[in-house]
Amino acid sequence: MSGGDGRGHNTGAHSTSGNINGGPTGLGVGGGASDGSGWSSENNPWGGGSGSGIHWGGGSGHGNGGGNGNSGGGSGTGGNLSAVAAPVAFGFPALSTPGAGGLAVSISAGALSAAIADIMAALKGPFKFGLWGVALYGVLPSQIAKDDPNMMSKIVTSLPADDITESPVSSLPLDKATVNVNVRVVDDVKDERQNISVVSGVPMSVPVVDAKPTERPGVFTASIPGAPVLNISVNNSTPEVQTLSPGVTNNTDKDVRPAGFTQGGNTRDAVIRFPKDSGHNAVYVSVSDVLSPDQVKQRQDEENRRQQEWDATHPVEAAERNYERARAELNQANEDVARNQERQAKAVQVYNSRKSELDAANKTLADAIAEIKQFNRFAHDPMAGGHRMWQMAGLKAQRAQTDVNNKQAAFDAAAKEKSDADAALSAAQERRKQKENKEKDAKDKLDKESKRNKPGKATGKGKPVGDKWLDDAGKDSGAPIPDRIADKLRDKEFKNFDDFRKKFWEEVSKDPDLSKQFKGSNKTNIQKGKAPFARKKDQVGGRERFELHHDKPISQDGGVYDMNNIRVTTPKRHIDIHRGK
């Protein structure tokens, strides 16, 4: 894995405020859709703006940026509801197609479903590495998309505002522009599919907008920055049936995982505050664009690119993040096994009980049949005293047979449940075994990557270099460590790899033949133990300086301080190496 170059431009892995390589906070996933990442419609190669390409990332501040307490939509008079209002229950995404007057939604402000409440509780953390989330729903654009992207349905999700804000919305000043929230509902991409996810883990804020009454009783308008005008009606009851819209599917795998670098890129959200005399509590509303398959692929490519770049310069943090995720998955697998063990134990108990009941019923039937045989000689002699006994025995047998049939059906159902429970437990145990192996591999990799943060002694001889030493930094595996620098550093102890990096550039600055290859600020940089700047064409985003790369990854037992294993690369070449180019 990469040794990176310094830490000054790569810090923030454990911070919720520092930017990384021009990316979002922490892991590149903090701060929401508009996190100062520098990725916006202006520098997005696929265009931007609502309904015209992809516009993930970018903007300023958290959430949607902007917005103010008086930014409720429209003139407060029309309330055009020519489109059928999409019913929106708390926590359930609904499709709404823009009409001439914007999006029409009818929010059912009843109780939040237990499933959504449990997920929000699970996301209270604490979490490392910035923003984490749970993908609740998947989006199937082929069932939603329209020919005109401006008329494509939006996915609208709502939550009770007071459930996600740090302070009651009713207590906010009327001119309050934003409010801090604990969770947001955003879109993200994974495995080339767009998802609607709940995210949490870093400080976030969203605009507060005021809903304005219209001429239609009970209908309000509100404008979320960057989204179509909302025409909202609210009722305080929960729909009897909470079903997903066509094209939106429930994700059965609800693992808590790091949110993506482009999470929230096609989502605009806000807290909507209603007039006091309306009797309605404030609601949080999230509006996400439905991406076409091509747009999803483009965004997934961008997500993968940014993930690779981050991993290349943060190998220890990446390994720790993967270990934390593997451990969380193992914990969930253990819980799954425990649930299935409980189910299987109950199934066995019921199975044994039903079997005992069936055995008893069969014995009763057998006794009745034996009694029939005992009086069978009187069957054809109605005048005989035993004939009545024969009839009674037959009636007993008939009733016993009915009971056996019922007990057999109950036993069969119990046997099926036991079989299903056995299979479910076996599958859960197999999944746990896979998660155990994954957790072990992640722990091993973390232990190896963490070696760069531990003391070590420099080894290796390096290689002879000429007066154009760093010309090779942008080629193949990079430029070698000069042999005369290796002679200076060999057998010396270093606190960590950052310490080695600093001493390496200091020694380069002391070498007359090598130092004369640097001019101006770069000469000053290496004298201070800082990496020199690469040429503009070899820089990528916030990565501007030459970097040290381990030819054999540390995760594969490559020597951390083995100077035969260390190369000097440009940022651009370093990224390409880790992409396998």
From Swiss-Prot:
Species of provenance: Escherichia coli
Q: Which parts of the sequence are annotated with region: Disordered? A: 1-74, 242-269, 293-320, 421-488, 513-566
Please give the name of this protein: Colicin-E2
What's its EC? 3.1.-.-
Q: Does the keyword Kinase apply?
A: no
Enzyme class comes to hydrolase
Which stretches are tagged as biased composition: Low complexity?
36-45
Q: Which GO terms describe its molecular function?
A: endonuclease activity; metal ion binding
Q: Which positions does UniProt annotate for Zn(2+) binding?
A: 549, 574, 578
Q: Which UniProt keywords apply?
A: Antibiotic, Antimicrobial, Bacteriocin, Endonuclease, Hydrolase, Metal-binding, Nuclease, Plasmid, Zinc
One GO CC term on file: extrachromosomal circular DNA
